[in-house]
From Swiss-Prot:
Protein name: Peptide deformylase 1
A GO term, aspect molecular function: peptide deformylase activity
Binding residues for Fe cation: 90, 132, 136
Reactions catalysed, as given in the entry: N-terminal N-formyl-L-methionyl-[peptide] + H2O = N-terminal L-methionyl-[peptide] + formate
Pfam families given in the database record: Pep_deformylase
Record: active site: 133
CC cofactor note: Binds 1 Fe(2+) ion.
Keywords: Hydrolase, Iron, Metal-binding, Protein biosynthesis
Organism: Bacillus subtilis (strain 168)
InterPro entries: Peptide_deformylase (IPR023635), Peptide_deformylase_sf (IPR036821)
Keyword Protein biosynthesis attributed: yes
Cofactor: Fe(2+)
Family: Belongs to the polypeptide deformylase family.
Leader sequence residues: none
């Protein structure tokens, strides 16, 4: 496992749709492990392959709940409902934070690292994290969805 350099905006790779993963091999497993290590090192809750310069439809998410680490390969949203607005940040946009409105519930079909399909149903913060990472796979920047920006001082004031 290795910590990789996170690509920061502006970078073309962040705005380019990623390619479908077709081979589930040791290289993919290493990519997912490197992404996970990088996410933890950077104190994130999710990371998509394009954020480390790899245009593959792969992401990892871990929000600190009992589900633990979730590898998402070739994810697609099957259903979504409800609405939530909350503050988001992104490892590819250091010190940029803002309100983003997303679905409160998503049902996602994806593949695990072995190529086995699974269904993930997520609500609240996990749904937010999954949608954020899936946007990266489509070349969509979270800044295109921000309705209100916050400074670090404003965030610190909110946290008390």
């Amino acid at each position: 496992m290795a910590v990789k350099k996170v690509v920061t905006h502006p970078a073309e790779v962040l705005e380019t749709p990623a390619e479908t993963v077709t081979v589930f091999d040791k290289k993919l497993k290493k990519l997912l492990d490197d992404m996970y290590d990088t996410m933890l090192e950077m104190d994130g809750v999710g990371l998509a392959a394009p954020q480390i310069g790899i245009l593959k439809r792969a992401a990892v998410v871990e929000i600190g709940d009992d589900r633990g680490r979730i590898d998402l390969v070739n994810p697609e949203i099957l259903e979504k409902s409800g609405e939530q607005t909350g503050i988001e940040g992104c490892l590819s946009f250091p010190n940029v934070y803002g309100d983003v409105t997303r679905a409160d519930y998503v049902k996602v079909r994806a593949f695990n690292r072995q190529g086995k399909p699974f269904i993930l149903e997520a609500r609240g913060f996990l749904a937010r994290a999954v949608q954020h990472e899936m946007d990266h796979l489509d070349g969509v920047l979270f800044t295109s969805k921000i309705s209100k920006y916050y400074t670090e001082d404003e965030l610190a004031d909110m946290e008390g």
